[in-house]
Amino acid sequence: MNALIREIEQAYMPKNFPEFRVGDTVRVHVKVKERNKERIQVFEGVVIRIKGSGTGKTFTVRKESYGVGIERIFPFACPSIDKVEVTKRGKVRRAKLYYLRERRGKAARIREIKEWEIRKRAEESKAAKENQ
């Protein structure tokens, strides 16, 4: 039964999402319908949590605008999401970054992982798997 549910859910899951984790800064392009027009609105912020699995999987993005913190929850299987871009990779040691809610400005910064570090780690893990 579980395999059947998982197979049905796979049909509804989007396949064009990039790989991102908690702590990454993402830019989410959302389709917004206003009367008879449809436009794309961009929401950029830090992923503070990823929750759930299957079609119920969601991620929460937090940004600060004019000194006010704004959080928005996006389902992975949402047809109104046009695309998701990862702008920065963050290095965090927590699965949920709720502590960012109390922090403002520079205190809310997250250490960034550079692209060459990501490639180096991928090569090292690939080499380790080949040696086993």
From Swiss-Prot:
Keywords: Ribonucleoprotein, Ribosomal protein. One of its GO terms (molecular function) is structural constituent of ribosome. The keyword Ribonucleoprotein applies. It comes from the Bacteria. InterPro entries: Ribosomal_bL19 (IPR001857), Ribosomal_bL19_CS (IPR018257), Ribosomal_bL19_sf (IPR038657), Translation_prot_SH3-like_sf (IPR008991). One of its GO terms (cellular component) is cytosolic large ribosomal subunit. The keyword Ribonucleoprotein applies. One of its GO terms (biological process) is translation. Pfam families: Ribosomal_L19 (PF01245). Belongs to the bacterial ribosomal protein bL19 family. This protein is located at the 30S-50S ribosomal subunit interface and may play a role in the structure and function of the aminoacyl-tRNA binding site. NCBIfam families: rplS_bact (TIGR01024). PANTHER family: LARGE RIBOSOMAL SUBUNIT PROTEIN BL19M (PTHR15680:SF9), RIBOSOMAL PROTEIN L19 (PTHR15680). This is Large ribosomal subunit protein bL19. It comes from Persephonella marina (strain DSM 14350 / EX-H1). The lineage of its organism: Bacteria, Pseudomonadati, Aquificota, Aquificia, Aquificales. The gene is rplS.
